[in-house]
Each structure stands twice: as structure tokens, then as C-alpha cells.
């Protein structure tokens, strides 16, 4: 699986904070034994403005891009539970965010809360993520984070909601986040089976 995430912080804009993801599902055979089926290549994307109540959870500072990049990285796994059990190459255009995600540590308490949620949720999803740097100009997720959908339209990408995990849950124990991941993945699996039967 290939994942790109991005964040935008433009304090002078009407919508100052935005997060986005793009996910590429390669064509592949899925299932086991005689139940195997071919699933065609597809793209999905999502973006959203970060609400004020979420921004108020961050420590006051002039620059929030680091926290927003981490929020985008967590949000894609929360929004796309089909990433469960997958090997993921995840591209981000912010080296500080990549370092924090790899180490699982930040000296900033608000960033540390996001990293805690990411680590626990990833364990619950059983997703194996490999983080790589991508220059901003080559990061396809930079486009939806700035309300540009032309290329994604050409790729036939389907829009999905970008779901920011509820902040009230961010301080929950790791076990709760793992259970949350399993529940979301199971719900998505049931919905996907329903969509296939309806075809």
C-alpha cells in the first residue's frame, strides 16, 4: 500500500489549518483458497479543515505545521481502516514528523499525545508502516490539503471522509486505542462485504 499525507498551516487564510491523505491500493488477489478474487487498482483521498476545538488542544505557538503533519499521519489510519494488516509505505514531506513517528517520541506534550495514539492504533490495525520523505512538490497529498483535486480526478480517486479521532479519547490507554482500531476495521469489512453483495 502507498500512503501520502500532508498538512497546511496558513494563519492568514480563512481556513488556516488543513490535513489530507491520498492512498493507492494496488491491484491484487484477495482472500484465501477458492474464495480468492481480483481487486482492481484504486485511489482514495480525503481532506478536512482542522476545527478550532482541535487547534485549541495544541500548545500556543506561531507555527503548528509539525503537530498538523502528525495529525494527518494518524488520521489516515483512522479514516481508512482497510489498511489493517497491510504493509504500508507512507510518504510525508516533513522530516521532523517522520523522525517523531519513527522514534515514537517528542519533547512537545501535544505531539507526544498524537504519537501515543498513532502507536496504539497501528498496533490494533496490525499495520506495518515504513516512513519515507517526499519533497512537497512531489507529494500528491499536498494537492487536496490546498483544495486542488485536478490530478486526483484524472486518477479516478474516490473521496473519503477525513476523520480526526475524537480528542477526548487521545489520552486513553493503548489497549483502548487498539480495540478502537479493531472495531473500525471490522465495521469497514462488514460494509465492504455489503457493497459487494449489492453489486
Task: Go through the PLM ranges and name each one.
Residues 26-71, 96, 103-109:
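A short, polar/acidic, helix/strand-boundary loop motif
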Residues 12-18, 83:
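Short, flexible loop/turn motifs enriched in small residues
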Residues 78-141, 146:
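RNase H catalytic domain
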Residues 19-23:
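Short beta-strand scaffold segments in enzyme catalytic cores
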Residues 193-197:
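Positively charged, lysine/arginine-rich intrinsically disordered segments
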Residues 72-77:
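Buried hydrophobic packing segments
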Residues 125-190:
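C-terminal functional segments of enzyme domains
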Amino acid at each position: 500500500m502507498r500512503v501520502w499525507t500532508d498538512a497546511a498551516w496558513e494563519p492568514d487564510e480563512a481556513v488556516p489549518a488543513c490535513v489530507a491523505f491520498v492512498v493507492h491500493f494496488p491491484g491484487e488477489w484477495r482472500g484465501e483458497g477458492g474464495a480468492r478474487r481480483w481487486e482492481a487498482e484504486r485511489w482514495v483521498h480525503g481532506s478536512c479543515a482542522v476545527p478550532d476545538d482541535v487547534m485549541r488542544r495544541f500548545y500556543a505557538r506561531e507555527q503548528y505545521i509539525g503537530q498538523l503533519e502528525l495529525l494527518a499521519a494518524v488520521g489516515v489510519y483512522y479514516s481508512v481502516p482497510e489498511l489493517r494488516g497491510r504493509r504500508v509505505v507512507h510518504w510525508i514531506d516533513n522530516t521532523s514528523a517522520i523522525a517523531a513517528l519513527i522514534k515514537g517520541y517528542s519533547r512537545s506534550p501535544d505531539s507526544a499525545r498524537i504519537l501515543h495514539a498513532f502507536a496504539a492504533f497501528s498496533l490494533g490495525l496490525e499495520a506495518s508502516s515504513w516512513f519515507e520523505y517526499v519533497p512537497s512538490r512531489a507529494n500528491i497529498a499536498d494537492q487536496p490539503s490546498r483544495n486542488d483535486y485536478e490530478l486526483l480526478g484524472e486518477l479516478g480517486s474516490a473521496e473519503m471522509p477525513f476523520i480526526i479521532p475524537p480528542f477526548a479519547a487521545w489520552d486513553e490507554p493503548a489497549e483502548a486505542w487498539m480495540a478502537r482500531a479493531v472495531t473500525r476495521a471490522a465495521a469497514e469489512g462488514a460494509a465492504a462485504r455489503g457493497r459487494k453483495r449489492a453489486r
